């Protein structure tokens, strides 16, 4: 699959218009319905390649956009969510520099 192609599992005659937020692979048991003894087998069935992880992140991004950004009367919530997420991300990547400041008596 090249960059910009549809997934191999997508069939326009069966699935209709393409939706980037939908997984077109074989359906599996949702994680919320997995029993404790089956978690290892469930994780073993996951596709852990970089392409699969990138596809999962892309689908999550599209689902978030469909829920918060694309509605006709979208509010200000997505902007606050992106702001908090970016603040958290930059705090985490700068934590190694910031953790030394808590021991300083005077700045």
UniProtKB/Swiss-Prot annotation:
Please name the GO terms of the biological process aspect recorded for this protein, alphabetically: proton motive force-driven mitochondrial ATP synthesis; proton transmembrane transport
Please give the chief subcellular localization of this protein.
mitochondrion
Q: Name one Pfam family in it.
A: WRW
GO cellular component terms given for this protein: mitochondrial membrane; mitochondrion; proton-transporting ATP synthase complex
What are the subcellular locations of this protein? Answer: Mitochondrion membrane
Keyword Mitochondrion appears in the UniProt entry = yes
Sorted alphabetically, the keyword list is: ATP synthesis, CF(0), Hydrogen ion transport, Ion transport, Membrane, Mitochondrion, Transport
Subunit structure and binding partners = F-type ATPases have 2 components, CF(1) - the catalytic core - and CF(0) - the membrane proton channel. CF(0) seems to have nine subunits: a, b, c, d, e, f, g, F6 and 8 (or A6L).
What this chain does, per the record? Mitochondrial membrane ATP synthase (F(1)F(0) ATP synthase or Complex V) produces ATP from ADP in the presence of a proton gradient across the membrane which is generated by electron transport complexes of the respiratory chain. F-type ATPases consist of two structural domains, F(1) - containing the extramembraneous catalytic core and F(0) - containing the membrane proton channel, linked together by a central stalk and a peripheral stalk. During catalysis, ATP synthesis in the catalytic domain of F(1) is coupled via a rotary mechanism of the central stalk subunits to proton translocation.
Q: What family does the Swiss-Prot or TrEMBL record give for this protein?
A: Belongs to the ATPase F chain family.
Q: In its UniProt entry, what is this protein called?
A: Putative ATP synthase subunit f, mitochondrial
């Amino acid at each position: 699959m090249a960059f910009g192609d549809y997934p191999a599992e997508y069939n326009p005659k069966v699935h209709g218009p393409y939706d980037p937020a939908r997984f077109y692979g074989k359906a599996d048991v949702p994680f919320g319905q997995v029993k404790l003894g089956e978690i290892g087998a469930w994780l073993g069935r996951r596709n852990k390649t970089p392409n699969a992880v990138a596809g999962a992140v892309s689908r999550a991004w599209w689902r978030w956009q469909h829920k918060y950004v694309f509605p006709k009367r979208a509010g200000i919530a997505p902007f606050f969510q992106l702001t908090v997420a970016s603040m958290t991300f930059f705090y985490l990547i700068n934590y190694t520099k910031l953790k030394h400041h808590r021991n300083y008596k005077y700045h």
